[in-house]
Amino acid sequence: MASQSKTSVHDFTVKDAKGQDVDLSIYKGKLLLIVNVASQCGLTNSNYTELSQLYDKYKNQGLEILAFPCNQFGAQEPGDNEQIQEFACTRFKAEFPIFDKVDVNGDNAAPLYKHLKSSKGGLFGDSIKWNFSKFLVDKEGNVVERYAPTTSPLSIEKDIKKLLETA
């Protein structure tokens, strides 16, 4: 059974910002928006602000936002996990979980990101193009949509609402 390939986001374990394992099966029954984040990107302010707005509005209806810091794009996430948490929580009042810094591309890409990319390739192939690429994952752990870094979080609200309304 252990060799069975992982077909659901819920099959993965990731590290939180303190280095503790988090089994993503704890999010079964939740709608997930998974985002690679950075503190020093031109997209940072708008994305963190809108992600926080979405989270505040829909967290009680079953939305979870999982943020994965990544330093692969323009070295725009140079801080350690503590600095990243401090930045997101103080500056943007982010209440959603921010996990351990990961690679999203290349040989050392986090297994979760390999799965996300193989489930929903981008317009120009599988690789993540920049900070704030977004993946929408349904309550069963299936990747249902991928959004470009420039897609504003509020512009996908209709997709979130639709998926929250399904069983």
From Swiss-Prot:
EC class name: oxidoreductase
InterPro entries named among the record's database cross-references: Glutathione_peroxidase, GPX_AS, GPX_CS, Thioredoxin-like_sf, Thioredoxin_domain
Entry-linked Pfam families: GSHPx
Induction comment: By salt stress.
Major localization listed first in the record, in broad terms: cytoplasm
Signal peptide limits: none
Active-site residue list: 41
GO biological process, one term: response to oxidative stress
Enzyme Commission designation: 1.11.1.12
CDD domains in UniProt: GSH_Peroxidase (cd00340)
Protein's job: Protects cells and enzymes from oxidative damage, by catalyzing the reduction of hydrogen peroxide, lipid peroxides and organic hydroperoxide, by glutathione.
UniProt similarity note: Belongs to the glutathione peroxidase family.
Protein's name in the database: Probable phospholipid hydroperoxide glutathione peroxidase
Annotated source species: Citrus sinensis
Name of the encoding gene: CSA
